[in-house]
Amino acid sequence: MSKGIITLFLLSNFALAQVDIELPELGDRVSGAISEAEVELLSEQFLQQVYSQAALIVDPIIQEYSELLLYRLSETSLVNDRNFTVLLIDDPSLNAFAAPGGIVGINGGLFLNADNESQFASVLCHELAHL
């Protein structure tokens, strides 16, 4: 009796493993989850909040380096809209973020803690994946 139950259990699990399950497209803005107008509005609101609450690093050399690296990395990404806004946040913590509308924030701590450009770029690639 127990061999029959075990066999039935194994066969049912095998049958379930063969079921074709449709997974949703993750991160696909064109699927209609959010309109381009809503993305633009969210982006504007987010930027206003950052500008009012966060201290920014104002350094043209670091800004240009970060933007050029981000654009270079985006050439091999799936990001269609490459109109990025790069924010350099004056915060020593090791962090970065992405927000709707192509906003990428980079904390100063990322510059301080990355041992080389590859480590820095890997974080930017991660943020690009959110866009």
Residue positions per predicted region:
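Sec-dependent signal peptide recognition
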Residues: 1-8
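Peri-catalytic and regulatory segments of divalent metal-dependent proteins
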Residues: 18-131
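N-terminal signal peptide c-region/cleavage motif recognized by signal peptidases
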Residues: 12-14
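Exposed boundary/loop context
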Residues: 8-10, 36
